[in-house]
From Swiss-Prot:
This is Sec-independent protein translocase protein TatA. Belongs to the TatA/E family. It is a single-pass membrane protein. Part of the twin-arginine translocation (Tat) system that transports large folded proteins containing a characteristic twin-arginine motif in their signal peptide across membranes. TatA could form the protein-conducting channel of the Tat system. The chain crosses the membrane at residues 1-21. The Tat system comprises two distinct complexes: a TatABC complex, containing multiple copies of TatA, TatB and TatC subunits, and a separate TatA complex, containing only TatA subunits. Substrates initially bind to the TatABC complex, which probably triggers association of the separate TatA complex to form the active translocon. A complex containing only TatA and TatB has also been identified. It could be either an assembly intermediate or a disassembly intermediate generated during translocation activity. InterPro entries: TatA/B/E (IPR003369), TatA/E (IPR006312).
Length: 89
């Protein structure tokens, strides 16, 4: 009903061949095939490299006390850095 029938596809194919010619369509087809082949090769080349270098993230559960200890250590480091900067001036 609303779809394209085989006859409509054949008519479109004949019109395309008449417009472009068989030589032009052949070269376009071979260029398209070569580009698809190159794309697939590039995709398969990237996958092994990605698998070798990728590592899962190391997530550790932290409690509130651990987080507070981390922030205290960071604050102490920044205070030491500030004192060191003041001493240099």
């Amino acid at each position: 009903m609303g779809g394209i029938s085989i006859w409509q596809l054949l008519i479109i194919a004949v019109i395309v061949v008449l417009l472009f010619g068989t030589k032009k369509l052949g070269s376009i087809g071979s260029d398209l095939g070569a580009s698809i082949k190159g794309f697939k090769k590039a995709m398969s080349d990237d996958e092994p490299k990605q698998d070798k270098t990728s590592q899962d993230a190391d997530f550790t559960a932290k409690t509130i006390a651990d987080k507070q200890a981390d922030t205290n250590q960071e604050q102490a480091k920044t205070e030491d850095a500030k004192r060191h900067d003041k001493e240099q001036v």
